């Protein structure tokens, strides 16, 4: 069985490419179906899961396709490029393709927060669990990926429970507040707009709430969900309310700070809307953070002199400031992961002989059943039971030994020597187990 992991992330690809290969939630299940069909396979259907976040898009696959690892990865790259209507040549230089133990190690590191922009962050573990849940609902997981992800989650729990990998961590939300404080002397005097109402916006809202902004507004496509977040902020003593997303173009200029993170596949805020907002504000500065992938705010907005626009990649330098303090924890985590990778590979190696063992049992059962029926016929016609048992045992012995003796008689050269060394050990093992 081949394990494959293929993807791009913030280490290998710019935001402009990552947003092209992001998967909206509603596309994941159909995409899993076409991916599994595209992967090479023989007897069993390929298994697959897709992890898509603001910092990475990764395909986790298991296939029994008897192809070289490079060929299997080429199939996956072509599928990813075709699915998103981009040229495979544009994508390939930024893709990492990992097989077997490397794929396992990568999954363990990602879930443990070792591969994140925010070292040790916990959000990625929840995102990976969501990806597995979606793949399960789509019927895309089987024995191998199920086992991989169950062990992945166990390793992540062990790493976080026995090391300080999450200590001194600066989240993306906290980094957004720090950047805003560089622009405005006091956030308490500013009006803040949050676009979206998902987990990332909730985290950002919580961090900004600690600064007690003058006014907080939540704009969301679904007003009810925006009102729920606004109510939670009001309960923290803030002046908070919700508006519909459609109201943004006319009201954007009211806000000093804008934080956006939606699942939209197209920009929500265009250059023209921001230009009008700046004129309305009489060129007072506007701080904007776009945490969405694909982006919610057109990148051309960054060229406006009165706008300070930051993306997830721009926040990277700030969130990495505490990384040096966690290097000892990283070393501990890597040691744990390496041990668990070896454990998983032992399990995988053991699984590789399961089909052979199953076939051996099926063959032996067929021989046993055939001779048993023959013996029952002999007894039915009145043959001596002792002679029937003798005939049964002799027939079973001959048939069980036919395959090994035939192979030994017809083997030549090195193959014959290997059989001579192997067969006695197999039969000794069998006799030991009988005792």
UniProtKB/Swiss-Prot annotation:
Pfam families linked to this entry: GlutR_dimer, GlutR_N, Shikimate_DH
Keywords carried by this UniProt record: NADP, Oxidoreductase, Porphyrin biosynthesis
Residue positions of the active site: 54
Record has Oxidoreductase as a keyword: yes
Residues reported to bind substrate: 53-56, 116, 121-123, 127
Keyword Transmembrane: no
Enzyme Commission designation: 1.2.1.70
Site-annotated residues for Important for activity: 106
HAMAP family: Glu_tRNA_reductase
UniProt name for this protein: Glutamyl-tRNA reductase
Organism for this UniProt entry: Ralstonia nicotianae (strain ATCC BAA-1114 / GMI1000)
């Amino acid at each position: 069985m081949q394990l494959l992991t293929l993807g791009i992330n913030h280490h290998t690809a710019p935001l402009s490419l990552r947003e092209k290969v992001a998967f909206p939630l509603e596309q994941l299940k159909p995409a899993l179906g076409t991916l599994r069909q595209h992967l090479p396979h023989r007897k069993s259907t390929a298994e697959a899961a897709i992890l898509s976040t603001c910092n990475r898009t990764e395909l986790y696959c298991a296939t029994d396709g008897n192809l070289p690892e490079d060929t299997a990865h080429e199939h996956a790259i072509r599928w990813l490029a075709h699915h998103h209507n981009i040229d495979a040549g544009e994508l390939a230089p930024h893709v990492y393709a990992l097989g077997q133990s490397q794929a396992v190690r990568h999954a363990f590191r990602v879930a443990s927060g070792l591969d994140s922009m925010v070292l040790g962050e916990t959000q990625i573990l929840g995102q990976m669990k969501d990806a597995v849940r979606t793949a399960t609902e789509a019927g895309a997981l089987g024995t191998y990926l199920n086992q991989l992800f169950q062990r992945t989650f166990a390793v992540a729990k062990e790493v976080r429970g026995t090391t300080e990998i999450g200590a001194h961590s600066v989240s993306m939300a906290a980094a957004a507040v720090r950047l805003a404080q560089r622009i405005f002397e006091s956030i308490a005097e500013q009006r803040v707009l949050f676009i979206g109402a998902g987990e990332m916006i909730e985290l950002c809202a919580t961090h900004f709430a600690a600064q007690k902004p003058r006014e907080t507004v939540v704009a969301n496509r679904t007003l009810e969900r925006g009102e729920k977040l606004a109510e939670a902020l009001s309960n923290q003593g803030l002046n908070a309310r919700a508006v519909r997303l459609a109201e943004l173009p006319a009201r954007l200029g009211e806000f000093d700070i804008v934080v956006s993170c939606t699942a939209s596949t197209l920009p929500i805020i265009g250059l023209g809307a921001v230009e009008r907002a700046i004129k309305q504000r009489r060129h007072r500065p506007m701080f904007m953070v776009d945490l969405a992938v694909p982006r919610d705010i057109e990148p051309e907005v960054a060229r406006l002199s009165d706008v300070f626009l930051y993306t997830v990649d721009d926040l990277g330098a700030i969130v990495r400031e505490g990384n040096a303090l966690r290097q000892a924890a990283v070393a501990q985590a890597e040691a744990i992961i390496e041990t668990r990778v070896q454990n998983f590979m032992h399990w995988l190696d053991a699984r590789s002989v399961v089909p052979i063992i199953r076939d051996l049992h099926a063959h032996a059962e067929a021989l046993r059943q055939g001779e048993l029926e023959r013996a029952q016929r002999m007894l039915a016609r009145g043959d001596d039971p002792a002679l029937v048992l003798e005939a049964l045992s002799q027939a079973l012995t001959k048939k069980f030994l036919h395959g090994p003796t035939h192979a030994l008689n017809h083997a030549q050269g090195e193959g014959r020597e290997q059989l001579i060394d192997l067969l006695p050990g197999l039969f000794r093992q069998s006799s030991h187990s009988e005792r």
